[in-house]
Amino acid sequence: MTERRHDREFVRTFFTSPTAVEGEDDSAKMLRRAAGLRGMQAPDVWVPDNEDATAPSMRDEGAENIVEVISEQGAEFPGEIHPRMVWHRDSPETRYQGFQHMLDITDPERGAVEHIHGFVIPEVGGIDDWKKADEFFTIVEHEHGLDEGSLAMSVIIESGEAELAMGDLRDEMGKPTNNLERLFLLVDGEVDYTKDMRAMTPTGELPAWPELRHNTSRGASAAGCVAVDGPYDDIRDVEGYRERMTDNQAKGMLGIWSLTPGQVVEANTSPLPPKTGSWLLDADGEEVELASEDGVEAYDGDRLSLEATDGGYELRVGGDARELTADELREELLGLTSYVPSMDDIVDSMEEFEAAKEAGRGAIAMTQSATLRIGGTEIDIEKDRMWDEATYQAAMTPISLFQDVYENRPDQHEELEERYGAGVVERAMEVGL
């Protein structure tokens, strides 16, 4: 696995705030509000946004607001702070403006830089453009006597050029001619990416761009960075936001842009293992979570029915009815069901495998069993899954994420212990070490 060089191995949330709001008595009010977020409402990475979220006429004032708010409140903020500057691969003037703002913000005498972990650079192009941005970071560090490479650089992937540049990172990082090892987050920007690709949809909505998200996750994994999905702008569509995160997580992209504190809460909790395990049933193409009732997993819908007969069982799925023996029914139901393990389940399995490995066994069988009730008919099912070292390492990802969160976000300890129980949290912090 490629080494990651930053304090955070995982980033769940990337939350942007305008740096200056025109027409307000206090133009920095959105920054002050964001700086006061705590617990699950506070993001892992807060991005005071001096680019798209702030009007061009307000950006000089926005840079001053960043200094003022972060110097006053940055020490207490529980996440990392990475302001977004202006930059564009085709505009030297824009790049220079962003550079000047970085110089002003990082002046040690102004008191903000000690709380700033890095900067976010949008609209990057090919790998040479990434190197230009990196050189500006190095100049800023030298100008203010900061350690070279101490400011992390995150980029927004908003063009085909930037997408292709991710394939060059492994060859370029670590060369003595650059400090690209400062790279931290690779963040998708699907709106500008859609414009750059000249893509269209009949409704005018953004394409889903699963290929971009896969490529960004792959590029981040290969380069030791962290992948983050772009903004989900239908802020009332909570279920759609959750589905997007679930799809991303299967690609290894565990972070997502958050536009509101409500989205931050959803994104902070989504990649964490569930509090309780649950059984899922494929009911004629619709995935349904079964209701757990006194140790029985029950389905009472109308897409699937089960009745006992003299010779066995009749299973009806949609309009298709089949006569099955008990063994045939169990085999069929094993193909229609799946189990979502809880945090406690994952920790139990990992502890069991660690004990077996210590006893000299390289692989063991883990059994999952349940009593299903479909309509009024019950039947027991069980299946074995072989665990070896590869299975163990794959299962470690959600635990590693939890450990990273618990170590870096003490402001969330109380909520995590309420969610799982102090005993499960303690055990989860010990497995895999």
From Swiss-Prot:
An example molecular function term from Gene Ontology annotations: magnesium ion binding
Residue numbers annotated as active site: 388
Residues reported in the UniProt entry to bind glyoxylate: 84, 158, 191-192
Cellular compartments annotated: Cytoplasm
Pathway where this protein functions: Carbohydrate metabolism; glyoxylate cycle; (S)-malate from isocitrate: step 2/2
Binding site for acetyl-CoA: 16-17, 84, 236, 259
Cofactor(s) demanded: Mg(2+)
An individual GO BP term: tricarboxylic acid cycle
Binding site for Mg(2+): 52, 158, 192
Catalytic activity reported: glyoxylate + acetyl-CoA + H2O = (S)-malate + CoA + H(+)
Listed InterPro entries: Malate_Synthase-like_Aldolase (IPR053484), Pyrv/PenolPyrv_kinase-like_dom (IPR015813), Pyrv_kinase-like_dom_sf (IPR040442)
pH effect on activity, per entry: Optimum pH is between 8 and 9.
Swiss-Prot/TrEMBL keywords: Cytoplasm, Glyoxylate bypass, Magnesium, Metal-binding, Transferase, Tricarboxylic acid cycle
Class of enzymatic activity (EC top level): transferase
Cellular compartments per GO CC: cytoplasm
Signal peptide (UniProt feature, chain positions): none
KW Ubl conjugation (keyword) present: no
Activity relative to temperature: Optimum temperature is between 45 and 65 degrees Celsius. The activity of the enzyme at 80 degrees Celsius is half of the maximum.
Assembly and interaction partners: Homotrimer and homohexamer in equilibrium.
Stated role: Involved in the glyoxylate cycle which synthesizes precursors for carbohydrates from C2 compounds such as acetate. Catalyzes the Claisen condensation between acetyl-coenzyme A (acetyl-CoA) and glyoxylate to form the malyl-CoA intermediate that is subsequently hydrolyzed to produce malate and CoA.
Record family assignment: Belongs to the HpcH/HpaI aldolase family.
Name of the protein in question: Malate synthase
Organism from which the protein derives: Haloferax volcanii (strain ATCC 29605 / DSM 3757 / JCM 8879 / NBRC 14742 / NCIMB 2012 / VKM B-1768 / DS2)
